[in-house]
Structures are given as C-alpha cells and as structure tokens.
A protein has these predicted regions:
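Structured nucleic-acid-interacting core domains from mobile-element enzymes and related host factors
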Residues: 1-39
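Short connector loops/turns at beta-strand edges and beta->alpha or beta->beta junctions
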Residues: 3, 42-48
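Acidic surface patches and DE-rich sequence motifs
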Residues: 10, 44, 111
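Non-catalytic regulatory appendages
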Residues: 27, 48-483
Length: 483
C-alpha cells in the first residue's frame, strides 16, 4: 500500500519514524513510501488476520522481499499455522522474488524448511492486466471458431465490443449488457485499475450479446472469435472465484473445486488456449498470459496437496488478495479524508481496523466483500441477534382469471435487440417468482427456443443441454414494453 513520505519524531523510542524499516533486516536512510503488508487467510475456515508489515522505499529489491517472505513463513510455522501457499499480484518485484525462491510457471511452488509453498498470482489482478493488454492488441488463439461455414483460427478484437455497445445502447428500454458504459470501453488511467470494469466487460452477458448480434448479422461473423475469448475469460474467472458448494446464478464454474466439479477438465482446456495465444503487434508476451497458466497450475497443486489433510473440496475464492485489499480500504477509511497516510498514521489506522474487525464500508472499493472474519480482534464489541423471519404466506386474493387482451400492440419486431433484451429481463423476474399456478404458467411461459425473441436468452444459458432460464410469452413481453 502506498503511503506518504514523512518523518516524525518518536519520543518514546527517541528516533525518527518514516524511514525504510525491514525489522530484523534493519533500517536505512531511504524515506518509506510503501507499507509492505502480510496477511494470513484460512483455506478451510473463513478467517483472516494481518500478521506483519514493513515500511519500504520506492523500490524494494527482489532478494530482500524473498528474505522477508521466508521470515514471515518461519514465524507462521512457529506459531502453529500450516501454510500451504502465498498470493501476490503481477508486480515485477513480486514475480522476481518468488522466482528466486524456486517457483516457476510449470512448477509454481518452492520448499521452505521442508514445507511445500505454492505461489498463486491474484486472479482479479490477472483479469485487469489482461483487459489492459486486450485494449491495445487483437488476440489470436488456436481454438476453432466457425466462421462462414469454415473452421478458422479465432481472432478477438476490442473493436467488436465497442460496435456491440454502440448497437446495444440504441434500444429504448432494454439492453443486452446494461452494466456497460463508456468507462468500460475507454477507461482512463485510474479506471484501468478497477477490477469491476474489467469483470463486467469480459462477462457472459457481453459474450451472449455478441453472439446474438452476429446471428442477426448486426456484427461481422469474425466477432464470434471475440465472443469466444470473452466467454472463456468469464468462465476462468468464475472457476477461480467459487465459494459455495452449489452453482451461483446457474454458473457451473462458480462453485467450490472438487473431484466431481468441472474445474480440472476446464483448466486443461484453458492451458492449451493460453499457451497458443498471441497478442498481435505486442513486442513480447504479456505477463498476464503466463500468469493465468501459472495460477491454474498453482490452484491444481493446492487442491492435490490438500487431500493429504482429508480435504476434498477447495473454496477457490479464498486464494486471492481481496481480504488484503479490503484491509487497505479499511485503513484508508480510518484515516478520514486522508487516503494517503504517513507511516505513523498507517500504524494507528491498522490498529483501529483490527479492533473494529476490519469492517470496510467504502462503497468505491476495488474488490468484493471477502466474507472472512478476523481471527483475533483483541476485543468483541458486536453480537449478532437472532433473526426473525416473516410468514411467507399471504392472504391477498388472486384473481381467478388473468387476461392480457386489449394490450396495445407495439411496433417492435420480435427479432429486435429491444424485444430480446425485454424477454430476458421478464424471464429473470419470472425465475425469481414462485409461480405454482398452472394457468399463470400457461399465460406467462413459453417453450424454450420456439420464439425469435428468445435468441439472446438462449445464448445466456450456461448449459447447452439443460435449460435453467425462463422463456416468456411474446405477448407478455409486449405488455411489459407498453407499461
């Protein structure tokens, strides 16, 4: 975390605070500009705990960072913790440090005092860096894509996403990708650091929208390659963020990793995909390309190593830096209107954050809630009370007859993007309604893939065999459009 350069006289220790301080490795006369922080995260249980921090100058060397990593690992093992891996982002110093320790792309682990330590690169950071490279270069990949009746090499272009957005936003009421804005397509320097923007543009909704526009000849046929790349990245990001034993929103990869889950087979498929990938016009291979390969190998290695502890499922969501990022957000919020604290302010804010359970109420944070409880806050302040549940039954009378006759017919063709997006939204609402009445089902629901207005909905399905979405009658969609 970046901190403000500042020197403060410490009357208690009779010294100036604010210099680079690496504890046992000594202090230097370089003024600190970063707080190098280590946090322990539970793999089996949802807990977190800040365990160490050091103050560094503008650039800590890779060999020094490697020494600090080993110091922290030794302390953790000495305290009785069984460390199985370390997580870091794509910063060059981090990569050089773990390489010095013995980790590599194909063997993402090193030995420390007889313990195997797996090295993982932060998946949200990988997605963000990949998007930044995709902004500048077309991506070629050796995955067959059907174009004009022939099998060809796929080429993904950012311009296809821009064309899709410009077409999609012309719909008056409903769109295929409502989250997309100009910030997603042309992010500035600060916006390029936002993981949310990268995840929303490289999403299943955008991939489905691209395919729907290609099917209606509103986008060129080679945009199928772009949809393939976007879809694969969405699935891979899901596979590295699963935190429940069941599917979330029907997404088959957004689950815990197990021997019966599709993760291992999908990782094998993605290894080929990323190995043969090329960023056209780039001088060298971007670090994020090998980073995905390294992280897939690392997650698979951890899953294998956990079996010796009789742990057969892995919550992959815990193998990222979100808890640490949320800790930094909590520290900044505890500094009031000063988001760039000095070293002294950092220490005070960290203490406050730990005592208050690392609660981060900042709405503009760069990651999701990690749902981990702090292991030791030194004092318990809050107690959760019992939650009360409302009776789900309702005495509101329901009319025996429902009629949508007389609804004014709109001049919106069923094949239009507007009607397709409306049909998907109506289906989304119907999916979250408890429709047990046979008459209501007849009025509202249609058979899958029987109406042209359901083209986008069919592309939104996560499973090609089993339909999990609701398909609404076109007449009902027209009533919603007219409302």
């Amino acid at each position: 975390m970046s901190i403000r350069k500042n020197l403060t006289y410490n009357t208690k220790l009779d010294q100036l605070d604010g210099y680079q301080d690496h504890a046992a490795q000594g202090r230097t006369q370089e003024i600190a500009s970063h707080a190098l922080t280590f946090m322990a995260i539970g793999v089996r249980k949802a807990w977190k705990q800040p365990i160490a921090f050091y103050f560094s100058g503008d650039c800590v060397t890779a060999d020094r960072l490697a020494v600090l990593i080993k110091e922290v690992l030794s302390t953790c093992f000495g305290a009785g913790l069984e460390v199985i891996g370390v997580v870091c982002d794509l910063d060059g110093v981090n990569l050089r440090a773990i390489n010095l320790l013995g980790s590599s792309k194909d063997r993402p682990f090193f030995d420390h005092e007889g313990h195997e330590i797996v090295t993982i690169l932060d998946p949200p950071h990988l997605l963000k860096c990949f998007r930044n490279n995709f902004l500048k270069h077309n991506v070629q990949f050796v995955q067959d894509v059907q174009i004009e009746g022939q099998r060809r090499i796929g080429v993904a272009k950012w311009s296809h996403i821009e064309e899709f957005y410009n077409i999609d936003k012309t719909n008056p009421n409903f769109v295929f990708a409502p989250a997309l804005t100009q910030q997603h397509l042309q992010p500035n320097g600060k916006q390029k650091m936002k993981v949310r923007l990268a995840a929303q543009v490289l999403s299943h909704s955008v991939a489905a929208g691209l395919l729907a526009k290609v099917a209606q000849n509103e986008l060129p046929q080679d945009a199928v390659g772009t949809a393939t790349l976007v879809s694969n990245l969405d699935k891979l990001f899901d596979a590295m963020n699963g935190d429940t034993p069941d599917r979330k929103r029907g997404k088959q990869y957004l689950t815990n990793m197990s021997s019966t889950s599709p993760h291992l087979d999908f990782f094998n498929e993605m290894r080929v995909f990323f190995t043969e990938m090329k960023f056209l016009g780039a001088r060298s291979k971007p670090p994020s390309q090998d980073g995905w390969l390294r992280t897939m190998n690392a997650i698979e290695r951890i899953f294998k190593n956990l079996k010796k502890y009789q742990i057969n499922t892995l919550c992959v969501r815990r193998l990222n830096q979100d808890p640490l990022e949320n800790c930094f957000g909590c520290i900044r919020s505890n500094c009031g209107c000063n988001p760039n604290p000095t070293s002294v302010q950092f220490i005070a804010a960290l203490k406050t954050s730990i005592i208050t359970n690392l609660i981060n109420n900042n709405k503009n944070r760069n990651c999701l809630d990690d749902n981990n409880d702090i292991l030791n806050n030194f004092k318990v302040f809050l107690h959760k009370g019992e939650q009360t549940t409302n009776d789900a039954s309702s005495s509101t009378p329901f009319p025996a007859e429902i009629s949508i006759e007389g609804v004014e017919e709109l001049d919106i063709p069923q094949c239009s993007g507007e009607m397709q997006a409306c049909a998907y939204v109506c289906g989304f609402i119907a999916k979250h309604m408890a429709i047990n009445c046979a008459q209501c089902k007849t009025i509202m629901l249609a058979d899958p893939n029987t109406e042209v207005c359901h083209l986008f909905t069919s592309f939104k399905e996560y499973d090609d065999v089993k339909c999990s979405l609701k398909y609404i009658q076109p007449s009902f969609c027209e009533m919603v459009e007219n409302a």
